[in-house]
């Protein structure tokens, strides 16, 4: 089957790593979370390698010393709550819109396309980030 090459009017765009670089804010939240549960904070490099599959997976890997972990016990729940609170407080630490994003979004809008941001960030943090960075003027929602 050949791909359908018709123009699409709806564009779904990933937030982290595509529209924004947020690793510094995530790292800051991981450090605060680690302190709250009494473990060594992860390095920036570890966080950079470990993000992308959601906060539950990231928190689990930190608690398990870098290994994949499916555990969602009370310790994990406490750490996840600490991470979520810390991220709301420090997501701005180094979070920035990537080069060329505003121009690309403006071009999509001027072509009559609708853009929606896809993210696995918690809703409150995602809403705040999109609004604060000015991405909300180009998109019709988050998924």
Residue map of PLM features:
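Hydrophobic "anchor" residues on beta-strands that sit immediately upstream
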Residues: 10-12, 116, 141
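A short, structured active-site edge motif that brings together acidic residues
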Residues: 45-46, 50, 77, 135-143
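Helix-loop "lid/cap" segments that line or gate small-molecule binding pockets
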Residues: 33-34, 54-71, 129
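Short alpha-helical
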Residues: 25-28, 54-57, 103, 124-125
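Conserved H-loop
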Residues: 40, 69, 111, 135-140
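Short, acidic loop-to-helix structural element flanking the phosphoryl-transfer center
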Residues: 6-7, 88-117, 123-127, 131
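Active-site neighborhood of HAD-like aspartate-dependent phosphohydrolases
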Residues: 2-49
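Metal-dependent phosphoesterase signature
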Residues: 62-103
């Amino acid at each position: 089957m050949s791909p359908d090459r018709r123009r699409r009017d709806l564009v779904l765009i990933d937030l982290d790593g595509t529209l924004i670089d947020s690793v510094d804010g995530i790292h800051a939240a991981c450090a605060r979370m680690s302190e709250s549960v009494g473990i060594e904070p992860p390095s920036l490099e570890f966080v950079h390698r470990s993000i992308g599959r959601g906060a539950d997976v990231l928190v689990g890997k930190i608690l398990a010393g870098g290994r994949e972990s499916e555990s969602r016990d009370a310790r994990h729940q406490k750490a996840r709550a600490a991470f979520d609170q810390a991220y709301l407080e420090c997501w701005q630490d180094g979070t920035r819109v990537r080069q060329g994003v505003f121009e690309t979004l403006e071009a999509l809008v001027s072509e009559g396309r609708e853009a929606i941001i896809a993210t696995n960030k918690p809703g409150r943090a995602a809403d705040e980030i999109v609004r604060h960075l000015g991405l909300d003027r180009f998109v019709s929602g988050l998924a």
